[in-house]
Amino acid sequence: MDASLEKKIADPTLAEMGKNLKEAMKMLEDSQRRTEEENGKKLLSGDIPGPLQGSGQDMVSILQLVQNLMHGDEDEQPQSTRIQNIGEQGHISLLGHSLGAYISTLDKEKLRKLTTRILSDTTLWLCRIFRYENGCAYFHEEEREGLAKICRLAIHSRYEDFVVDGFNVLYNRKPVLYLSAAARPGLGQYLCNQLGLPFPCLCRVPCNTVFGSQHQMDVAFLEKLIKDDIERGKLPLLLVANAGTAAVGHTDKIGRLKEVCEQYGIWLHVEGVNLATLALGYVSSSVLAATKCDSMTLTPGPWLGLPAVPAVTLYKHDDPALTLVSGLTSNKPADKLRALPLWLSLQYLGLDGIVERIKHACQLSQRLQESLKKVNHIKILVEDELSSPVVVFRFFQELPGSDPGLNAIPAPSAAASAVGRERHSCDALNRWLGEQLKQLVPMSGLTVMDLEVEGTCVRFSPLMTAAVLGTRGEDVDQLVACVQSKLPVLTCTLQLREEFKQEVEATAGLLYVDDPNWPGIGVVRYEHANDDKSSLKLDPEGEKIHAGLLKKLNELESDLTFKMGPEYKSMKSCIYIGMASDDIDISELVETIAVTAREIEEDSRLLENMTEVVRKGIQEAQVQLQKANEERLLEEGVLRQIPVVGSVLNWFSPVQASQKGRTFNLTAGSLESTEHTYVYKVQGSGVTPPQTPTGTRTKQRLPGQKPFKRSLRGSDAISETSSVGHIEDLEKMEQSSGGQEASEANSHERHPEAPAPPEAEPPGALQDGAQGLQDDRPQVEEPESLR
């Protein structure tokens, strides 16, 4: 086009201009096109998250992001989390998930054969290891999912028309699911939500109250419930028994429960941590009876320390169609591949490795049981001391005159308030003990739980934690040592609680706060003058006083810990006093709190009123100074106020009057004249500031004795001679101080005209003078012969 343009236009200058214009227009168009494309990309990528924009990220950046998400930011405070011990068996289990994703890419025929082999092998191995003959297996991620599928299977088995008529069949004859009162929390609600059943279909079977363990299902009461449901036209469908309850690891009487279920045609399902002991050579009869049940749920992941391993539900049923409808079996290869991590891990561990891990956990629990039996003030809640793999213990304190056998449950004749107070005190202390042990021995895997009857307890379940955390026998010994080291603190604190309550209630201005969740000596609140006792709202003035009180108490550097927080039932601030590790003088502690809080309140009132006092004083001073200035004008006259004339008059006749000043005394809150300051060249006030209020009792402490400690006169920590020496020094100090006070009093009472005694006299003269004063007789001069 450029050549044709040059041919048509003969003028070279005009042709050059056309060429340049064309290039310029092309540049502008290209620039506009690029701008529109970039704007279009921005609009398109504005809704796309940052990590997805662009052409993607490399693997290193992605793994770095995952690491940051796992471990958190560096600025965050590190939390004490349990680190799972992932060994080679753990890597094998994790490899199973990646290998399963790779296997799923095979062709259908190879995938079907491989998944069938993996599923059949794993099912056979688990049935042989845990003595469950001729069983089928269902692998699931959620532990409760297997039980929900079993309930569906039981419904299909008992209601033949359920597939056709659906829930209309259930409406005519409602099914009943029986769960123990010691079952895991939320299990019944989960089953009803999964099955679409109303909550009245659940029946909670109570535990024993008179004979046997209080965490075992009451079989006689169960039979009564079943008979009542049958009479009401209901269908007893399924019973969930425990081989190791979720709380304390107790096992139900599975043998008797199996007989009851066979009698009434009820499906028996067993779950619990004690099922792991079926792999051992010796198994208790109560757990061995679980092999005759209709189904059971196993959790080999925690038992063997295998991460990301599914739970397994073993069951016995002959109709494959019903199991398929219930969801226990599936034709999808992906569902069968759930068993791959467990299939790899079981082969890696072998039978010896599996038995060794379960046996090691049981030995740890037995070791802890035997050690805690020798520790005083520790009660062990164990069903069977020979085979129980779960240890539950709690701290207790025997009441004076009580039966040692009734450690956890107070006597029925005791008052309800005393029983509740004792229960809450022990619960708070056990909660503190459990948290301390978890921090000191993190490899133990302890958990703190609240039981309905026993209260707060500490649970050691090595079957669920030992393989994961790598717990050893040395960790158990360290745990026992930590328990023994905390017992003096617990016993001392519990003994001082009642004394602290009595002292606080007897002290004016202090209010004892009953907080059942506080494990320390107690909680106290100072009631200031403007405190509204009926209000539960936040009190700013009280919060300020308690904040100052907390600061003063912490400055004493005692062995006690003090904290400030809201009251248990309101938002008012309180002082929380922590655990006592030694014998504490409660009366001195309470008195110190009361006196210090009163001083802080008075100081705060003084500061609040200071602004108003100073303002009024300044106004009064201004008025007085203005009056003084007017009086000066009247005395000097008007002529002296004229600049030139006043200077001449002042030179011939100087003014003798002095300037009257005023000073404001903050201590007295009054105006005073400055004449005393300028005439006598002395600054000061005749008003003596008030003394700082102190406690009514002043306690002499021995050297090195911390605040709030009782007297060490009877202590074995100090030698007899040293303690006697310290006591004599204290008595001498008291006598000397008392003698000085007496001499000062006598000197003030003496007549002002009486001559002062000489500076130095012989001892005899002093004695004669003292005798003369005592007899109140005139002194007669001795003859020279007697001198």
Swiss-Prot record:
Biased composition, class Polar residues, residue ranges: 685-697, 735-745
GO cellular component: intracellular membrane-bounded organelle
Pfam families attached to this UniProt entry: PDXDC1-like_cen, PDXDC1-like_cen2, Pyridoxal_deC
Region (Disordered): 29-52, 683-787
InterPro entries the record matches: GrpII_AminoAcid_Decarb, PDXDC1-like_2nd, PDXDC1-like_3rd, PyrdxlP-dep_de-COase, PyrdxlP-dep_Trfase, PyrdxlP-dep_Trfase_major
Modification Phosphoserine occurs at: S653, S711, S719, S723, S747, S785
Lineage top rank: taxon: Eukaryota
Modified residue annotations for Phosphothreonine: T688, T692
Stretches with biased composition (Basic and acidic residues): 29-41, 774-787
Gene Ontology molecular functions: carboxy-lyase activity; pyridoxal phosphate binding
Enzyme Commission number(s): 4.1.1.-
Gene Ontology biological process: carboxylic acid metabolic process
Keyword annotations of the record: Decarboxylase, Lyase, Phosphoprotein, Pyridoxal phosphate
Cofactor: pyridoxal 5'-phosphate
Disulfide bonds: none
The UniProt record lists the keyword Phosphoprotein: yes
Coiled coil (residue ranges): none
Family, similarity comment: Belongs to the group II decarboxylase family.
UniProt-listed PANTHER family: PTHR42735, PYRIDOXAL-DEPENDENT DECARBOXYLASE DOMAIN-CONTAINING PROTEIN 1-RELATED
Name the UniProt record assigns to this protein: Pyridoxal-dependent decarboxylase domain-containing protein 1
